[in-house]
Amino acid sequence: MKRFTILGIILICFAALCFGQRRPRDTSRRTRSAPKKIIQLTEPKLMGTMSFEEALSNRKNIRVFTGETLQLSQIGQLAWAGQRATMAQRELSTILSTEELNLLELYFATEEGLFKYRPTEHTLEQIYDQDIRSELSLATSMQETISTAGCDIIVAGNIRRLASRMRTRARTYTALEAGYTTQNILLQAVSMDLGATKIIDFNSKDVGRICRISRGLEPICIISVGYPTNQGDTETRQDAKNKRAVFIVPS
């Protein structure tokens, strides 16, 4: 009987020792995630001072910017032109389902951080509160353009949403949609007296990581928009037309 009593005391002491050595819960790591910042954009202007033909004529690639920040109303107009307007046009068609209408997502990299555009609500959702443009520029072939632009717009596509039905043509169709969006944004920038250019030479994996692009999406194009410098690197169709090639043939 005495032996069982001693054994019981030993077990109780061992259990107390183990319980006392248990680490307290680390509540410092269990912090609440900061609420997402949602910015309501102003309604876009449906009437401008420049005709469509003038916008086409004035369209040029601006590769150097002043670095001046764009106004929120300007960003809202670019976002509308890039996605909300085209979504409204697609909704008139019965070819695509509701899920397939949202093939693209637009990410806006600005001085205030990184934002995702929500076309249905016409809002910007902040997904990162730091300026990523310098880091983003390192993943592209046009570092000065990215870093000096007032805003860099990343166009990302979800090819998987069409893969089950279009199979091999899903990538082509998504690329075409990205092209429509890019052209709309470029022309909208011209109509607001802003400079812009598209960038397609970049490291997709690095851009996706830096921009925290959602899984299943693939970055297709980057559009840099800003205020052009007086001596910006530009090229227009008229400039190309005025160029002449001279062949020197030895006699």
Where are these regions (language model features)?
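Positively charged n-region of N-terminal signal peptides that target proteins for export
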Residues: 1-4
